[in-house]
Regions:
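A cross-kingdom feature marking solvent-exposed beta-strand/loop segments within repeated
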Residues: 1-8, 16-52, 74, 112-136
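Short, structured motif recognition centered on aromatic/hydrophobic residues
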Residues: 6-11, 18-25, 54-64, 88-93, ...
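Short, Lys/Arg-rich amphipathic alpha-helical interaction segments
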Residues: 131, 135-153
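A short secondary-structure junction motif
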Residues: 67-71, 126, 149
């Protein structure tokens, strides 16, 4: 999944308009114009399409955490320079205040069965012997399950 796909999916799941999206970026200390946001949200084959880079997506996810959980006291965390699916999944879990069992249920809503041990392997340090890279399929199914839960209730 591309960063733009993730941004589009989260926007759809939460039914956010442009103003809300721009305020989420702003809460994480990144000013984004409506024009810039529009370019990130366009289909990949559109001539005006622009790639959303890792620090920009990390800033959005930090802003989403601020929006959903409240802004932390003190300085805003610096956005990661490089994102992995593992980090994205972790940030989404924090934003939506999800525990491991909640994530497993969301994956089941998307017809994907993952054990608790497999899930915990995604959140280990990369140099840990049981670390496992989160594949795009897992992230895609997590977002699908989140969509079923939040849009169909």
């Amino acid at each position: 999944m591309t960063n733009n796909d993730i941004l589009r999916r989260v926007r759809y799941i939460l039914d956010f308009n442009d103003d809300k999206m721009m305020s989420i970026f702003k809460s994480a200390e990144l000013e984004v114009s409506r024009d810039q946001l529009s370019k990130w949200l366009k289909k990949d084959d559109d001539t005006d399409f622009e790639n959303l880079n890792d620090p920009q997506l990390a800033t959005f996810l930090n802003g989403l955490i601020n929006e959903k959980r409240g802004k932390r006291e003190g300085e805003q965390p610096a956005p990661e320079k490089s994102l992995t699916n593992n980090i994205i999944l972790r940030k989404l879990m924090i934003a939506f205040n999800l525990k491991s069992d909640d994530v497993l249920k969301l994956l089941e809503l998307a017809d994907l069965r993952v054990s608790k041990h497999e899930l915990s392997a995604f959140f280990r340090k990369p140099n840990h012997k049981n670390y496992r890279e989160c594949q795009s399929q897992i992230l895609r199914n997590f977002l699908s399950g989140l969509q079923v839960k939040l849009r169909n209730t």
